[in-house]
Amino acid sequence: MKKQLDQLTAYTPGLSPESLKKQYGIRGELHKLASNENVYGPSPKVKTAIQSHLDELYYYPESGSPKLREAISQQLNVDASRILFGAGLDEVILMISRAVLSPGDKIITSESTFGQYYHNAIVESADVIQVPLKDGGFDLDGMLQQIDNKTSLIWLCNPNNPTGTYFSHDELFNFLKRVPSDIPVLIDEAYVEFVTADDFPDTLKLQEDFDNAFLLRTFSKAYGLAGLRVGYVIASEDAIEKWNIIRPPFNVTRISEYAAIAALEDQEYLKEVTQKNSFERDKFYQIPQSQHFLPSQANFVFVKTSRSQALYDALLNVGCITRLFPNGVRITIGLPEQNNKMIEVLKHFEY
């Protein structure tokens, strides 16, 4: 058994509404707003696509999701040979880490970011440098200072989970200019569809100038397919060819591929979802207490407080399950009535 596994624990999902009702003695409905899921669900066209292909369940999937790869290739205008799929971005991160890292290698990322970068590096006996956040966001200059000849991967999350903060196109461009070209920079844009900032990076454009800039995206968030597990990376052909050796043969299911294609085709529905999210997100920042909130470009708001357990409990008492952190609470933006209840709590909470 790998000794480094003793440094880790298995991922612990939030408690279910039923478990929380029992633990806290709550009656009435509880709304799960802890995992940044799209509360509006997927496009109706996804449900139609799933139903129309149920008779194919006894077939193995087509390895590599060729139909979905071609659909993304056409929509984003990238060569299909540069796209690799995983069962969610969790598996993509695992495959990249397994393919790239050897014992003693080093990854650089941030504190208070998505935990799978750290987790998979430790599994591969790599060292992890976590640079503290600066004003709630990635300290890109601080990360540059940590690069040395042991650095094998750099992980960025934009917008960052759990803070919702982002760095701009110019900031990313200047960062990439200073990173040695042989070090892959993985840019996780799981929440990109929710972004409204005009200066958010055009990472696909930056890839034209930086061969080591690799982009990760998912169907779990804005497209509402978290339960079907479809994520992907757009990288150089050489990198994809190597990483594909690690990919399990049938990792993305047949139904998941059909569902993702249907979701991708319904851009009008995606636009409706992201506009609703933007409107509801803005409501949180219209109250004076928003001085305690980190600015978000995602479908969640991070509330800073030294009394995070008390805030979590207060939100739970109005029927909303959120995500507890030592220095705050992350609130997934819900339906209007759910958000209104949470905003009332936030207005009267003592931070």
Curated annotation (Swiss-Prot):
Positions of post-translational N6-(pyridoxal phosphate)lysine modification: K221
Record's catalysed reaction(s): L-histidinol phosphate + 2-oxoglutarate = 3-(imidazol-4-yl)-2-oxopropyl phosphate + L-glutamate
Listed EC numbers: 2.6.1.9
An annotated Gene Ontology molecular function: histidinol-phosphate transaminase activity
Residue intervals passing through the bilayer: none
Domain of life: Bacteria
InterPro entries: Aminotrans_II_pyridoxalP_BS, Aminotransferase_I/II_large, HisP_aminotrans, HistidinolP_aminotransfase, PyrdxlP-dep_Trfase, PyrdxlP-dep_Trfase_major, PyrdxlP-dep_Trfase_small
Biological or metabolic pathway of the protein: Amino-acid biosynthesis; L-histidine biosynthesis; L-histidine from 5-phospho-alpha-D-ribose 1-diphosphate: step 7/9
Pfam families, alphabetized: Aminotran_1_2
Swiss-Prot/TrEMBL keywords: Amino-acid biosynthesis, Aminotransferase, Histidine biosynthesis, Pyridoxal phosphate, Transferase
Class in the EC hierarchy, top level: transferase
Cofactor(s) recorded in Swiss-Prot or TrEMBL: pyridoxal 5'-phosphate
GO biological process: L-histidine biosynthetic process
Gene3D superfamilies reported for this sequence: Aspartate Aminotransferase, domain 1, Type I PLP-dependent aspartate aminotransferase-like (Major domain)
Subunit annotation: Homodimer.
Family recorded in the similarity comment: Belongs to the class-II pyridoxal-phosphate-dependent aminotransferase family. Histidinol-phosphate aminotransferase subfamily.
Name of the protein this chain belongs to: Histidinol-phosphate aminotransferase
